Amino acid sequence: MTEIKKLIVLTSGGDAPGMNAAIRAVVRTALHYQFEVYGATAGFAGLVNGQVVPLNSRAVANCIQRGGTILKTGRFENFRFKAVRDKAREFLKKLQIDAMIVLGGNGSFAGASKLYQEGGPQMIGIPCTIDNDIQGTDYCIGFDTACNTALQAIDKIRDTAFSHERNFLIEVMGRSSGFIAVNVGIAGGAEIIALPEFHVDIDTLTQKIKKQHGKKSASIIVAAEANQPGHSFEVAKQIKEKTGIEYRVCVLGHTQRGGTPTVKDRVLASLMGAQAIEALKKGLTEKMIAYQNGKIAVAPLPDPDNGTRYFADEALLRVNNIICAM
């Protein structure tokens, strides 16, 4: 087991509220154990381009309440090429980096894992995505904040929907999973929740709309983006053509990725960040800090080819149908 003296932390992929709380915990826990800590800016691109900054306790002060990431982030597609990873590995070797902590999702973990297998430093992943769709953990940093941001928007839209007696189709993020949609749909009292995991064809959807039409002065559909951002405009168009009922479309978009992290995201991010350092001290590598059954745990990395988690509790949709049908 290699003794860790120098550590690097980076954020990769899409940003998520709570990342800064995790960075802060990583840095200060590492400093507690006398590690020398660095941060790579703009994700894996920072390792290739030599964009690295030393991090001390003051560098992460006053960031726990901030959304986004102080280290910047991004997707770096070229990291899939070995020649590019070799350049990153040589740079880390030159800096004498012993371990790396990656905040991100499946693709980010896979990149760091390959780097380790090719002679790079020990690595631990911390799951950060508002989509909450990483296999092996019940919770990902950023999800709670994103849900609260979306819910605030839905509550405001419902105010105007009621005032004008209008119907709205609200599209939320989530990529190919429906965790955001089902949570904010139930919390926002949506009459219909549309998820990619339980696909409903347009004819079934319009029949449901016609059955509900007239019972209320306004109606809200919450739909997951289902890997097709903006698809709700076409859905609303088909609803109008088949039923004559108009639905105004509101795509919440990237507003869900920003904002001050909630208590839940700050606390879990802090605990996960600290646990990542403890895992490295035990000599662990190619692991993820997960939230399982209400506890912080160390788990295997998700399968890079099959690491997406999907919403599966159809009973929640049935409950919402009963509550919102009246």
UniProtKB/Swiss-Prot annotation:
Matching Pfam families: PFK
Cell compartment(s), UniProt: Cytoplasm
Active site: D131 (proton acceptor)
Cofactor: Mg(2+)
Record-linked SUPFAM superfamilies: Phosphofructokinase
Catalytic activity from the UniProt record: beta-D-fructose 6-phosphate + ATP = beta-D-fructose 1,6-bisphosphate + ADP + H(+)
GO biological process: canonical glycolysis; fructose 1,6-bisphosphate metabolic process; fructose 6-phosphate metabolic process
Annotated binding of Mg(2+), by residue: N106
PROSITE patterns xrefs: PHOSPHOFRUCTOKINASE
Ways its activity is controlled: Allosterically activated by ADP and other diphosphonucleosides, and allosterically inhibited by phosphoenolpyruvate.
Role noted for this protein: Catalyzes the phosphorylation of D-fructose 6-phosphate to fructose 1,6-bisphosphate by ATP, the first committing step of glycolysis.
Family: Belongs to the phosphofructokinase type A (PFKA) family. ATP-dependent PFK group I subfamily. Prokaryotic clade 'B1' sub-subfamily.
Identification of the protein by name: ATP-dependent 6-phosphofructokinase
Organism: Coxiella burnetii (strain RSA 493 / Nine Mile phase I)
Lineage: Bacteria, Pseudomonadati, Pseudomonadota, Gammaproteobacteria, Legionellales
